[in-house]
Amino acid sequence: MSSQLIPATRRVLNNAPLLDAAHGKTPTRTPVWFMRQAGRSLPEYLKVREGISMLDSCFMPELLAEITMQPVRRHDVDAAILFSDIVVPLRAAGVGVEIVPGRGPVMDQPVRTRADIDNLPILDHEVTEVSKGISIILDELTDTQALIGFAGAPFTLASYLVEGGPSKNHERTKAMIHAEPETWHALMERLVPTVVNFLKTQIDAGIDAMQLFDSWAGFLTERDYTEHVLPYSTRILQEVEQYQLPRIHFGVGTGELLGAMSRAGSEVMGVDWRVPLDKAAERIAAVSGPKVLQGNLDPALLFAGTEPLTREINRIKGEAAAAIAAGNATGHIFNLGHGVLPNTVAENITEAVSIIHAS
């Protein structure tokens, strides 16, 4: 991996609303991007993905670049989010994993013993297919549009590995945490360099910001999160701090964990739709001081029609403004409180972006 702190390929963006907001400056308009904005809600996505598996498409530079750019062209969002998947770094390291349609990532072999952990491959090289894809994306983005890279946090990766795939209850994961804490911590230690090196691939290729996704952290108590998860997410964010790009931290169902998660060290905290933004800001500021907020429209509102959608967007923007006025937040990036739902009508997303920018 490159040891260069600020890559030569990094763009200098002086008028990108998302980066201005992430740095606590006043943007020219409310920046917005949506988690899963590149995906099944877009007919053009379904067309280019036809006959190609999800994971394979993440390792095809021209295709991943095209998919990344589709929602930017269509919706006028203020950022592209790299088309990838949480398990891509595992696949790149040599872990046997496939994304099964209708189910999600499924491991060839679950990781449940210390021997399994010791044999778990570690990503120690650049993922060149991703680097090449980022280069193509950067050639098309304007200087007002940021490129966000991302990686899954080690807890979420560990859960997929231990459970062998998606889980409704994460019972094997929680059992390992409590019954075999040394084994659990060994697994988390093993995953940290894989996550860091996947982020460094993206940083060296020139991304403008990054998000650490902890999709399943909301299944944990605050005590378990603080003791068994937080130290590893903190280390990952510390490892990339030197590159001087905004770091976003997000998990689903993490309203009760926002204070704890904020201690990991990101500049921006993602909030899901279950917690009002001004209340979320209070929880974050009480622990870590004011941060930039990201969120938090319920994805289901994209099915509700113009009037309810406009009302909810204005409510959320009002909560963000109140949090900033109270000194509990330093900025706001508009997003959903989770990913775009697969059956969302693409035109509804475009309308939401227009309302966010106009109001």
From Swiss-Prot:
Tell me which stretches of the chain form a coiled coil. none
* PROSITE patterns, sorted: UROD_1, UROD_2
Chief subcellular location equals: cytoplasm
Annotated catalysed reactions: uroporphyrinogen III + 4 H(+) = coproporphyrinogen III + 4 CO2
Q: Which UniProt keywords apply?
A: Cytoplasm, Decarboxylase, Lyase, Porphyrin biosynthesis
Query: What pathway or pathways are given for this protein in its record?
Result: Porphyrin-containing compound metabolism; protoporphyrin-IX biosynthesis; coproporphyrinogen-III from 5-aminolevulinate: step 4/4
CC per GO annotation:
cytosol
Main enzyme class: lyase
Q: Where does substrate bind?
A: R36, Q37, A38, G39, R40, D85, Y160, S215, H338
EC number(s) given by UniProt: 4.1.1.37
Which residues does the annotation list for site: Transition state stabilizer?
A: D85
Q: Which InterPro entries match?
A: UROD/MetE-like_sf, Uroporphyrinogen_deCO2ase_HemE, Uroporphyrinogen_deCOase
Q: Which GO terms describe its molecular function?
A: uroporphyrinogen decarboxylase activity
The protein's job, in short, is:
Catalyzes the decarboxylation of four acetate groups of uroporphyrinogen-III to yield coproporphyrinogen-III.
Q: Which HAMAP family is this protein grouped with?
A: URO_D
PANTHER family in the cross-refs: METHYLTETRAHYDROFOLATE:HOMOCYSTEINE METHYLTRANSFERASE RELATED, UROPORPHYRINOGEN DECARBOXYLASE
Q: Which NCBIfam families match?
A: hemE
Spell out the subunit comment.
Answer: Homodimer.
Q: What is stated as this protein's family in its record?
A: Belongs to the uroporphyrinogen decarboxylase family.
Name of the protein described by the UniProt record: Uroporphyrinogen decarboxylase
Q: Which organism is it from?
A: Corynebacterium efficiens (strain DSM 44549 / YS-314 / AJ 12310 / JCM 11189 / NBRC 100395)
What would be the name of the gene that encodes this protein? hemE
